[in-house]
UniProtKB/Swiss-Prot annotation:
It comes from the Eukaryota. Residues 69-78, 408-418 have a biased composition (Polar residues). InterPro entries: FAM13. The keyword Ubl conjugation does not apply. Interacts with ANXA2. This is Protein FAM13A. Residues 159-171 have a biased composition (Low complexity). Expressed in the mammary gland, with similar levels at all stages of development, including pregnancy, lactation and involution. Induction: Up-regulated in alveolar macrophages following Pseudomonas aeruginosa infection. The modification Phosphothreonine is found at T402. Belongs to the FAM13 family.
C-alpha cells in the first residue's frame, strides 16, 4: 500500500522547489501521513481477519507451513509479545519519519522498493533526522540540498528484501495486536508533529540569543526522550557532506564595529537613519524614559539603538565637579531681599501658630514646630537669613568706616564700569594716599591763605567789624578754601576730621546766614523787634507798662561814639537806614531781589505809625482795630483762594516753598495779626486804667 501512495507524494515534490527556506512546509503533510497510517491499519486488520478465517478452515500442517508467525505468537508469553510490538512500532515510526522527510530529498529514492527500510536502518535514520533537526537550530549556513544528496547516496545500498519479509510478518498479526499497534502509531505521529513544530523556519536573519537557547534546550529534551526509548546509535557525521574538511564557527554576513561584546545585535537594516547621524560625528542620545521599562543594559553601548538617556552612555561626558552646583552660582542676596524673605517666613510661621492655637487652644512650642517638617524648614531658613542679614550689615558698616573721595551716584549700578577702570581707580587711590598731605597741614595752609587775602583787601578778622562788601568777599574766600579742602580729603567723615575742620565750617555758616537772612535780622531800637519776639512783655495790673525802656538802653550801649538822643524819632530814622543798608547788602551778595524787599520802607513807616498808638485814645484804638480786622479778612480770603486753586491743580496742600507767588500777602497777613494782638493789649490796658481811676 505504501508503494501506491508514494507516486502521489513524488508528484507533489516535483512541483515544490527544493530550498532550505521551505523546510517548514512539510508540516502540512502530517495530515496526509496520518490518513495513510489509518488506511494501512485498516488494510492490515482486514487482511489478518481474512487470513485467520482461511487458516481456521485449513489443517494444522498447512497453517504451520504457510503462517508460522501467528502460531508462534500464540505460544510465546505476553512479555515477549510486548517486546515484539515495541520493535514493530519502531519500524513503523521509522517508515513514517521517512515518508514525512522524503520531500526534502531531491533525488534519493525513485522506486517503490526503495521506500521500505529494515528496522535497524530505520532507527539509525530516525536518529540522524533528530540530530539534523538539532543542528538546524544553530546559526550554521549550509546548503541542505548538497547535504541531503550526500545522505541519500550513503543509504542507497542499505535496502534489502528483509524489510519486505518483516512487512509480511506484520500482516499475520492477531486482531488483538492490531489495536495496540494503531494506538502506538498515533502516538508516534503526535511525536512526529511535535518534532516538526519544534523546527522553526530560517526565514529570519537573526534571532535573540535567549530564544535560540530555549530552542536548543527543547531539542535536547526531545532527544533525551527519544534516546530513552530508542537504543543508542552513532550520530550523523556531517563532515562527509562537504568536500572541505576544515570546520569553523559560522561568520555572520554583517559585523558591527565593536564586535567585542557578546550582546545580541539588531538587524543592520534598522539603523540606516542613525548611521547618517553617526557619519556627522553626532552621538545619539538615549530617551529619558528608557530606564523606566527595565534594567536591561545590552543596548547602551550600541550606536545603532534609538536614542536613550545620556547618563549611561559610555561616550557621554560627565559633569565636571569643578563647575560647581546651582547653589554656588546663586548671587549673594542684598539686605533688602533678605529682609523681604525674613518677613515672608515670619508671616508663614505666624499663620501656622494662629491655626495651631485655634485647633488645640494653646500656642505651639518649639517641639510642635519641629514636628512639622514644613514649619521646621521655615524656621531653619529664617535663622539662616537672619544670620546673612546680620553679616551683610556688619560688612556694610565696615566699608562705610573708610573715607570716600566722593559720594557715589545712586542712579548707577554697583557693577558700572569695567574691571580695568576699577583697578585704575584703586591704583590712583593708593597713589593719592601716599602723596596726600594730612588734614592738619591742609588746614594750616588754608588759614594762611585766608589771612593773606584779608591783609591784601584790608578786611578785619572779626565779622562784626566788616562792611557789606567785606562780608561778601569773606564768604567767597571761605567757600573757595572749603572746596579746595574737599577736593583733597573729601568731606570730613571721621570724628577727628570734623573736630579739626569745625571752626572753618562754622565761620562759613555764620557769614552765609548773615548774607541770606539780612531781611529777618532784628533791628536794634525798633519797636517791631520787640513785636517779632516770641512773647510780649507781661502786663501787670496796676503798673504802667514801659515798652521802650530796654530798647533805649540797647541804643545807648551800641552807640558809643554818638550821643544818646531822647527823641524816639531820631532812633527810628537810624534804624530805618540800618535796615535799608542790610537789605542792600543782601541784594548785592546773593543777586536775588525778593518781592518783600520793595515793601520794607513801608514797614518803617508802619513802625512809626505803631509808635503813636501808645499815645492814642481808646476810640482811636478801637477804630484802628476795626480797620486791621477788615484788612485781615481780605488778605485771608486771597490766601484761601490761592490755597484752594493750588490743591485743585496739584492735589496736595500748599507747602512753605510753594508760597513764593503769595509771599507778600503771607508776610502782610502775619504783620496784621501782630498789630491786632498789640491793639487788643493796649485797649485792655486802657480799660483797666480807666476803671482804676
Amino acid at each position: 500500500m505504501a508503494c501506491e501512495i508514494m507516486p502521489l507524494r513524488s508528484s507533489q515534490e516535483d512541483e515544490r522547489p527544493l530550498s532550505p527556506f521551505y523546510l517548514s512546509a512539510h508540516v502540512s503533510q502530517v495530515s496526509n501521513v496520518s490518513t495513510t497510517g489509518e488506511l494501512l491499519e485498516r488494510t492490515i486488520r482486514s487482511a489478518v481477519e481474512e487470513h485467520l478465517f482461511d487458516v481456521s478452515n485449513a489443517g494444522d500442517q498447512s497453517s504451520e507451513d504457510s503462517e508460522p508467525g501467528p502460531s508462534s505468537a500464540s505460544s510465546i508469553p505476553t512479555r515477549q509479545r510486548g517486546h515484539q510490538f515495541k520493535k514493530q512500532d519502531d519500524v513503523w515510526h521509522g517508515c513514517d519519519k521517512e515518508l514525512i522527510n522524503k520531500e526534502n530529498i531531491p533525488s534519493g529514492f525513485s522506486g517503490c522498493a526503495e521506500c521500505i527500510l529494515n528496522s535497524q536502518e530505520a532507527e539509525r535514520f530516525q536518529d540522524d533526522i533528530c540530530d539534523y533537526v538539532g543542528e538546524r537550530s544553530k546559526p550554521k549556513r549550509q546548503k541542505s540540498s548538497s547535504r541531503l544528496a550526500k545522505l541519500s547516496d550513503n543509504h542507497d545500498g542499505a535496502l534489502s528484501m528483509e524489510s519486505l519479509s518483516s512487512m509480511q510478518s506484520q500482516e499475520t498479526l492477531e486482531p488483538e495486536a492490531a489495536e495496540p499497534l494503531s494506538s502506538e502509531s498515533k502516538e508516534i505521529e503526535r511525536g512526529g508533529r511535535d518534532t516538526q513544530h519544534c523546527e522553526n523556519p530560517t526565514m529570519k536573519i537573526q534571532e535573540h540569543p535567549s530564544l535560540s537557547d530555549t530552542k536548543q534546550q527543547r531539542n535536547q529534551d526531545g532527544e533525551d526522550q527519544q534516546e530513552s526509548f530508542v537504543p543508542d546509535m552513532p550520530q550523523l557525521d556531517l563532515t562527509a557532506l562537504c568536500d572541505e574538511k576544515t570546520w569553523e564557527e559560522p561568520i555572520p554576513s554583517w559585523q558591527p564595529e565593536n564586535a567585542d561584546s557578546d550582546e545580541a545585535r539588531l538587524s543592520p537594516q534598522a539603523g540606516r537613519l542613525i548611521h547618517q547621524f553617526l557619519d556627522e560625528d553626532s552621538d545619539p542620545m538615549l530617551s529619558p524614559r528608557f530606564y523606566a521599562y527595565g534594567q536591561s543594559r545590552q543596548y547602551l553601548d550600541d550606536t545603532e539603538v534609538p536614542p536613550s538617556p545620556p547618563n549611561s552612555h559610555s561616550f557621554m561626558r560627565r559633569r565636571s565637579s569643578s563647575l560647581g552646583s546651582y547653589d554656588d552660582e546663586q548671587e549673594d542676596l542684598t539686605p533688602v531681599q533678605l529682609t523681604r524673605r525674613i518677613q515672608t517666613l515670619k508671616k508663614k510661621i505666624r499663620k501656622f501658630e494662629d491655626r495651631f492655637e485655634e485647633e488645640r487652644k494653646y500656642r505651639p512650642s518649639h517641639s510642635d514646630k519641629a514636628a512639622n517638617p514644613e514649619v521646621l524648614k521655615w524656621t531653619n531658613d529664617l535663622a539662616k537669613f537672619r544670620k546673612q542679614l546680620k553679616e551683610s550689615k556688619l560688612k556694610i558698616s565696615e566699608e562705610d568706616l573708610t573715607p570716600r573721595t566722593r559720594q557715589r551716584s545712586n542712579t548707577l549700578p554697583k557693577s558700572f564700569g569695567s574691571q580695568l577702570e576699577k583697578e585704575d581707580e584703586k591704583k590712583q587711590e593708593l597713589l593719592d594716599k601716599a602723596i596726600r598731605p594730612s588734614v592738619e597741614a591742609t588746614l594750616e595752609g588754608i588759614l594762611r591763605k585766608l589771612q593773606e587775602k584779608r591783609v591784601e583787601s584790608s578786611r578785619p578778622e572779626d565779622i562784626k567789624d566788616m562792611t557789606k562788601d567785606q562780608i561778601a568777599n569773606e564768604k567767597v574766600a571761605l567757600q573757595k578754601a572749603l572746596l579746595y579742602y574737599e577736593s583733597i580729603h573729601g568731606r570730613p567723615v571721621t570724628k577727628t576730621e570734623r573736630q579739626i575742620m569745625k571752626p572753618l565750617y562754622d565761620r562759613y555758616r555764620l557769614v552765609k546766614q548773615i548774607l541770606s537772612r539780612a531781611s529777618t535780622v532784628p533791628i536794634i531800637g525798633s519797636p517791631s523787634s520787640k513785636r517779632r519776639s516770641p512773647s510780649l512783655q507781661p502786663i501787670i495790673e496796676g503798673e504802667t507798662a514801659s515798652f521802650f525802656k530796654e530798647i533805649k538802653e540797647q541804643e545807648e550801649g551800641s552807640e558809643d561814639d554818638s550821643s544818646t538822643k531822647p527823641d524816639f524819632a531820631v532812633t527810628l530814622k537810624t534804624d530805618c537806614s540800618a535796615h535799608c543798608f542790610l537789605d542792600q547788602l543782601e541784594d548785592d551778595a546773593d543777586g536775588f531781589i525778593s518781592p518783600m524787599d520793595d515793601k520794607m520802607p513801608s514797614k518803617c513807616s508802619q513802625d512809626s505809625g505803631l509808635s503813636n498808638l501808645h499815645s492814642a485814645s481808646i476810640p482811636e484804638l478801637l477804630e484802628y482795630l476795626q480797620e486791621m480786622r477788615e484788612e485781615k479778612k481780605m488778605i485771608r480770603k486771597k490766601l484761601h483762594d490761592f490755597e484752594d486753586n493750588f490743591f485743585r491743580q496739584n492735589g496736595r496742600n500748599v507747602q512753605k516753598e510753594d508760597r513764593t507767588p503769595m509771599a507778600e500777602e503771607y508776610n502782610e497777613y502775619k504783620h496784621i495779626k501782630a498789630k491786632l494782638r498789640l491793639l487788643e493789649v493796649l485797649i485792655s490796658k486802657r480799660d483797666s486804667d480807666s476803671k482804676s481811676m
